UniProtKB/Swiss-Prot annotation:
Biased composition (Acidic residues): 14-29
Source organism, top-level taxon: Viruses
Polar residues bias: start-end ranges: 48-57
Protein name: Uncharacterized protein 089L
Length: 98
């Protein structure tokens, strides 16, 4: 695998690990004892069930969330890749000095 692909793969896997850790933390923070009304639909998007009739359909909301997540991951991967490139350059400069 070429060096750049390894770098992107490493950055991607690091970002995915961080993203999974954040999700696990959010899930553990949101764990609450069940109430008497277990049939109530969760409002993860912050929308009340009655607000779905205001022109926002569930597939549109899901698509928007997926797009937002994709953009977020792309920006994090880019930042991580740039960071790793800078680290590699610093290491190379350190080894090239007499």
């Amino acid at each position: 695998m070429p060096r750049d692909k390894k770098l992107v793969h490493r950055a991607t896997s690091d970002v995915e690990d961080e993203d999974n850790d954040q999700r696990e933390e959010e899930w553990s923070d949101n764990d609450q004892p069940s109430t008497k009304d277990d049939t109530a639909a969760p409002t993860e998007t912050g929308l009340e069930p009655s607000s779905a009739s205001n022109g926002h359909s569930q597939p549109a909301i899901v698509a928007a969330l997926e797009q937002e997540r994709r953009q977020h991951l792309e920006s994090i991967i880019l930042k991580r890749t740039l960071y790793l490139q800078q680290q590699r350059q610093k290491q190379q400069e350190g080894t090239n000095r007499p």
